[in-house]
Structures are given as C-alpha cells and as structure tokens.
A protein has these predicted regions:
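Contiguous beta-strand segments within globular domains
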Residues: 159-170
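Hydrophobic residues in beta-strands and at strand termini
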Residues: 6, 26, 60-62, 75, ...
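Active-site-adjacent substrate/metal-binding segments within catalytic domains
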Residues: 35-62, 66-74, 79-85, 92-95, ...
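Accessory beta-strand-rich segments of carbohydrate-active enzymes
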Residues: 3-16, 30, 46, 51-150, ...
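Extended acidic/polar, glycine-enriched regions
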Residues: 109-111, 170-240
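Short strand-coil-strand connectors
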Residues: 15, 76, 87, 182-186, ...
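Short acidic/polar inter-strand loop motif in beta-rich domains
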Residues: 121-128, 224-227, 248
Length: 339
C-alpha cells in the first residue's frame, strides 16, 4: 500500500471554540501552547500546563476514479481518547493515547473534498504523572491501494535460526496471485499465493545484528502493482540462567528508561530529535532503551535498529502518584476500552 503523509493543511482549536482554528503542522503538541499556572490540576507532573480538549481539521481530497480504492488512515499517536470524524460521521474512537490505530475510510468517503475532524481530550486533568502533551503529537498518514495489494502490515519477518541463518518472511495479500520477494544479496524468488504465503530463506555468511554492529537487510515485496519495503536484522534473543542473551551470547543490559517527550519540543515526535536522543545514549555507553511508560514511536524503534540499541516496549502504566488514576483506570479497564 502507498503511504501519503498528512502533516500539513491542519488547523487546531479548543473544542467548542467558534473562531477558526490556527494552522498547524504535524506532529503537533497542543498542550505546549497552553498557559502554565500554579493552579494547574496536573501540577508538577505535567509542568503546570493547563489541560484542554482540542479539535483538529483538514480536507481530504479523493478523485472520483479512486473512490473505490482502499483508503485507511493511520494515527501513530493521539493524546488522548481520540475521536475521528469524516464528513460529519463518527468513524472511530480510540481510548488511551500512546498506541497507533487505523481507520477504514470506505463507509464515509465521497468523491472530491472530505472533511476530516479529530478530537483529542486532555481536559480530564489530572490524567498523567508525567508530561503527556496533547493532540496529534505523532505522524498521521493515509494508506491507499487498488483491489490487488499487499495488506497493511502484511509483511512479517522472523529469524528462525542463526546456524544456518534462516529467516521466515510471511506475506499477506488482498487476493490470490504471484508474490515476488527480493532480499539484498539473494536471488529473487516468486511464489503463488492464495492470500498468504511464507518464504523460508537461508542467508549464507549472514551479517548478524549485534550491539556493536547493527547490520540490517532490506526486503522488497511486490504483488501486482503494489510494493512493500521492510528492513530487518538477523538476531535471536533469549533468557536463562545466564541472564539475557543476544544471538546466543550473554549481554549485560546497560539501559535507560526514557519518556516520549523531546525536551523543549514537548511531546512532538520529531525524527531528528529521536535520532539525537538515541545517539547520545549510545555515545554515553547505553545499549538498551525501555520506553517509559507506554509504547514508543515507530521512529524510536527504527532508530534503535539503526544504532544497535536494544529496545523494550512498555505497554501501559497510568496514575498520578503511587495510586492508579481513577479517570484513566475507569476509561481503559472498567469501561473495556483496553489499550
């Protein structure tokens, strides 16, 4: 599927305001522009910023000859409890604020201009014991494809063994057909698929991904007129009486627990800021990162791959002190929202 970034053309305003929103470029941290007061409900945990709810808007234009194509919106991170509206209809609700999610646009689109609105909540203070930011703080993109295409997230790569070096590449498609796969240094292979096919590949003289040398391979998958490109490292992980092992070798974890904010940029997920963060940690002697206290961005995971830094993904931790935050607890768990 083809990814089109939707980073420009947005406006943002407080939910309920009647004045036009101000133009913003994504990723955008709306909380960063709010006043800081001693009476802020979040207090020291959120830097004394006040909390508000926000409404983002932009136009999504779809040519008539592409209306029958697949259109899927991806939001990499919206803080929090996002509502997505297309042409006045509620297309999705996403509780939590740190996981990416997808919205199938098919039932709501029309040829020509479409009104896209996203509501992000943050007035329910206090809702965090760290600076969360607010709004569309990670990238948004539109995935499109014709009838025959590789499914979104339809390429999965797994290291089976190191001696011999074998990887398993699983490809899922929207229809039967021929799948072509190319991995650098290996001959091109093709297989007929009924919608899902597996390519077991042996890599001679494989270059392993290690904490000293982050060797990465590039995999290109083609199906009909569609294409997907993924990178992967040859590595195995384990845990036993000798502790953590990587590629069968014991590794002493020298890790840091880092939050998703980027200092003066607030919660904005800027690729250069993320790269700088990982680079500085590696230069200081760290070899691992744990995302605190929630799933991190795709940008951070990719940078860890490039910088030979192991990564541990936190799922969720909420609360404003040592006790669970009743607002988030009720929304996510009692209400069955999940994460």
């Amino acid at each position: 599927m083809k990814a089109t970034p939707l980073l420009t053309g947005w406006t943002c305003r407080h939910l309920g305001d009647t004045a036009p929103g101000r133009p913003v470029t994504l990723p955008h941290d709306a909380m960063l522009a709010e006043p800081r007061t001693a009476l802020s409900a979040g207090g020291v945990n959120t830097g004394w910023y006040e909390g508000y709810d926000y409404e983002y808007q932009r136009t999504l234009t779809v040519p008539e000859n592409e209306l029958s194509d697949t259109h899927i919106l991806e939001f990499e991170g919206v803080y929090h409890n996002a509502e997505v509206w297309l042409n006045g209809q509620k297309a999705a609700f996403r509780p939590y604020g740190y996981t990416n999610f997808y919205v199938d646009c098919a039932p709501f689109l029309r040829a020509g201009d479409n009104e896209l609105r996203v509501i992000a909540r943050n007035a329910d203070q206090p809702n965090s014991r760290w600076y969360s930011g607010a709004g569309l703080y990670r990238p948004v993109q539109l995935w499109t494809a014709g009838d025959k295409h590789i499914l979104l997230n339809g390429v999965r790569i797994r290291t089976v063994s190191l001696e011999p070096a074998v990887v398993e590449i699983r490809v899922r498609t929207s229809a039967p057909g021929t799948v072509q796969l190319m991995v650098e240094g290996l001959p091109t292979v093709r297989k007929e698929s009924d919608g899902e096919t597996i390519f077991p590949l042996t890599i001679d003289n494989a270059r392993l991904w290690t904490p000293e040398m982050p060797n990465l391979y590039r995999c290109r998958v083609q199906f009909a007129d569609d294409e997907a490109v993924e990178t992967f490292g040859m590595r195995t992980v384990g845990w036993g009486k000798n502790g953590f092992t990587l590629n069968g070798e014991r590794v002493i974890i020298q890790g840091a627990c880092i939050h998703h904010d980027n200092g003066l940029l607030g919660a904005v997920c800027d690729p250069d800021a993320v790269a700088r963060k990982v680079r500085l940690l590696k230069e200081t002697g760290y070899n691992a990162i744990r995302s605190a206290h929630n799933p991190c961005s795709k940008a951070l995971l990719a940078e860890c791959d490039r910088r030979a830094c192991s990564s541990w993904m936190n799922t969720s931790t909420t609360g404003t002190s040592t006790r669970p935050n009743t607002i988030m607890y009720r929304i996510l768990w009692i209400g069955g929202g999940g994460t």
